[in-house]
From Swiss-Prot:
Mg(2+) 2 binds at D310, D312. Contains an N-terminal zinc-binding domain, a central core domain that contains the primase activity, and a C-terminal DnaB-binding domain. One of its GO terms (biological process) is DNA replication, synthesis of primer. Its EC number is 2.7.7.101. Its cofactor is Zn(2+); Mg(2+). This is DNA primase. RNA polymerase that catalyzes the synthesis of short RNA molecules used as primers for DNA polymerase during DNA replication.
Length: 605
């Protein structure tokens, strides 16, 4: 789907970024700009800046920002099209969406919307059946006995599917919906012998399952009579994909951002009870393991995740497996260990809301501390396990991003191995495996475990540490940003592959795409051409970098010559690569680059 560019431009021109951001951030004027606490991460010192002149915002802490569309996308976790539509409504500009591909693609989008509409429409009748009918009385009593108040039932949209094979079927048919589409949406099942349709959910308490935008895309039907299965969920559909959905994310997102932490539970019933008790940053998967898509969503909100699974053997095993994976993905992982045999719902039922929130606040351990406490008996009595887990825990602690949290974990873990914190710290340093060499892709590289590493963002502070060649690349790009004629005059003069700084290389390509559609460079428009926070950071930093007046004669040509230097690499470049090889621990590469530097120095003598 595509929105006409003229509409996008009109909405952008009518939306003042200062007014928009002020709805979410308390801003104070500092010079020509405005500054406030970043809405995307927790901070005590303001680092979020808004430029009224350039109509952009930027956080120097988490690197997020952009123009009005990108700010709206990030703050509401929505797509670009949704952001344009929302801002269009804000400034009374009608958004005309046209198809850019085939009519079938438009039909797919239309079908998805109808599936959501069916789910939301039937929810009203499920709620009515639970709260207003005789048939729903037993299910309602069941909920009330388990602490569900009328207000909570209404807030969560909980309902009841009557014990009828055609309640949902007949209702949707009367409303004019395609029954085959209702089947594809997961609301109906089908008899494969005669292809007749019937209700998937019968005689069950119905819990709506929502996507990140708060739209109902599926259901979980819970039995209250002992029938199996205990929970019957919607099947995988175009709008309901378990690997992409986290229960309660729509409600918890704001608290997750504010607290800079997400708490992962095992089931949605635990989430509802925990949220009611006052723990607002809680989510759960839909009965599946945490997927890479889930982790991607979580990364957008916070780098801190706390696991609070059931206090049984299965919960412990799941905590160890999930925590290990999250740690290797670069997240700070913590664990809340519930008493044996209890889940959050049971803990709240036994001890109450206040005791639960106090417990959660005071009983949070690092993943390394939790892991060693689980394995302590084996460590104490099995020398082979002692050595194995010492290496494992050393590695786990080395993966932690915060040096403060690392030291805390060292202090907590060391006693389990009967060593001092200093000895454990030395062991961590000793056992850090040298990284294997993984070639960098266009945006970054890979660590020794094959994990993706994003490139270092080029912020203003880092501009002071650029090599001679990178400084030439920076100045060259800055001149190209001045006007389209300069860009056209010099675009063919350099080979993009000669850029040593990968961020600058892609800015060069962005400028090509930008000037193909625009005559005058504007940072607020240019940031729409990038999807990466790192590249957006580079564009904004280049915008803030000032050249000294007009270029002197042949100045730009001099930059071109530096960028296009042929032959062997400069010593400066080789030194840079040697430092990188040292950083990743590749001994062979270190030897190679050192030999090149020695040879280069001999040539100079």
């Amino acid at each position: 789907m595509r929105i006409d560019q003229s509409i996008i431009n009109e909405i952008k021109d009518k939306t003042d970024i200062l007014d928009l951001v002020s709805e979410y951030v308390k801003l104070e004027k500092r010079g020509r700009n405005y500054i406030g606490l970043c809405p995307f991460h927790d901070e005590k010192t303001p680092s979020f800046t808004v430029s009224e002149d350039k109509q952009i915002c930027h956080c120097f802490g988490c690197k997020k920002g952009g123009n009005v569309f990108q700010f709206t996308q990030e703050i509401k976790d929505i797509s670009f099209v949704e952001a344009v539509k929302e801002l269009g409504d804000r400034v009374n500009v009608a958004v005309d969406i046209e198809a850019t591909q085939s009519n079938s693609n438009v039909q797919i989008a239309s079908d998805d919307l109808q599936m959501i509409e069916m789910h939301e429409l039937i929810q009203e009748f499920y709620y009515y059946a639970l709260t207003k009918t005789v048939e729903g009385e037993q299910a309602l009593t069941y909920l009330q006995e388990r602490g569900f108040t009328d207000a909570l039932i209404k807030e969560r949209g909980i309902g009841f599917a009557p014990d009828s094979s055609h309640f949902c079927h007949d209702f949707l048919q009367k409303k004019g919906y395609d029954i085959e589409l209702a089947y594809e949406a997961g609301l109906l099942s089908r008899n494969e012998e005669n292809f007749s349709y019937y209700d998937r959910f019968r005689n069950r308490i119905m819990f709506p399952l929502k996507n990140a935008q708060g739209r109902i895309v599926g259901y979980s039907g819970r039995t209250y009579t002992g029938q199996e299965p205990k929970y019957l969920n919607s099947p995988e559909t175009p709008i309901f994909q378990k690997r992409k959905l986290l229960y309660n994310l729509d409600k918890a997102r704001k608290s997750i951002r504010k607290l800079d932490e997400i708490v992962l539970l095992e089931g949605f019933m635990d989430v509802i009870k925990s949220d009611t008790a006052g723990l607002k940053n809680v989510v759960a998967t839909m009965g599946t393991q945490l997927s890479d898509e889930h982790i991607t969503f979580i990364r957008k909100l916070t780098s801190n995740i706390t696991l609070m699974f059931d206090g049984d053997f299965a919960g412990s095993e799941a905590t160890l497996k999930t925590g290990q994976h999250l740690l290797q993905q670069g997240l700070n992982v913590f664990v809340i260990q519930l008493p044996s045999g209890m889940d959050p719902d049971e803990y709240i039922g036994k001890y109450g809301n206040d005791a639960f929130t106090t417990f959660v606040k005071n009983d949070k351990k690092s993943f390394a501390h939790y892991k060693v406490s689980i394995l302590k008996d084996e460590i104490a009595h099995n020398d082979l396990s002692y050595e194995r887990y010492l290496k494992e825990l050393s590695h786990d602690i080395s993966l932690m991003k915060s040096s403060i949290l690392q030291q805390k974990a060292i202090n907590d873990v060391a006693p389990f191995f009967n060593v001092s914190p200093e000895q454990l710290a030395n062991e961590i340093q000793f056992n850090q495996a040298p990284a294997n060499y993984y070639p960098e892709d266009e945006y970054g590289g890979y660590d020794e475990y094959g994990g993706y590493i994003e490139p270092e963002p080029i912020g203003m502070a880092q501009f002071d540490n650029l090599s001679r060649r990178e400084k030439a690349e920076r100045a060259f790009l800055k001149h190209l940003m001045r006007d389209k004629d300069t860009f056209l005059n010099y675009y063919e003069s350099v080979d993009k592959d000669n850029f040593t700084n990968q961020h600058f290389k892609y800015v060069f390509e962005v400028l090509h795409d930008f000037y193909a559609e625009n005559d005058q460079y504007n940072i607020s428009d240019a940031v729409q051409y990038v999807n990466s926070n790192e590249l957006r950071e580079t564009l904004i930093s280049l915008e803030q970098y000032n050249l000294n007046g007009e270029p002197y004669e042949n100045e730009i040509d001099d930059y071109v010559n530096v960028i296009n230097e042929k032959g062997q690499e400069t010593i400066e470049s080789l030194n840079h690569k040697l430092r990188e090889a040292t950083r990743i621990g590749d001994v062979e590469l270190q030897k190679y680059y050192l030999q090149q530097i020695v040879a280069k120095n001999k040539e100079r003598m």
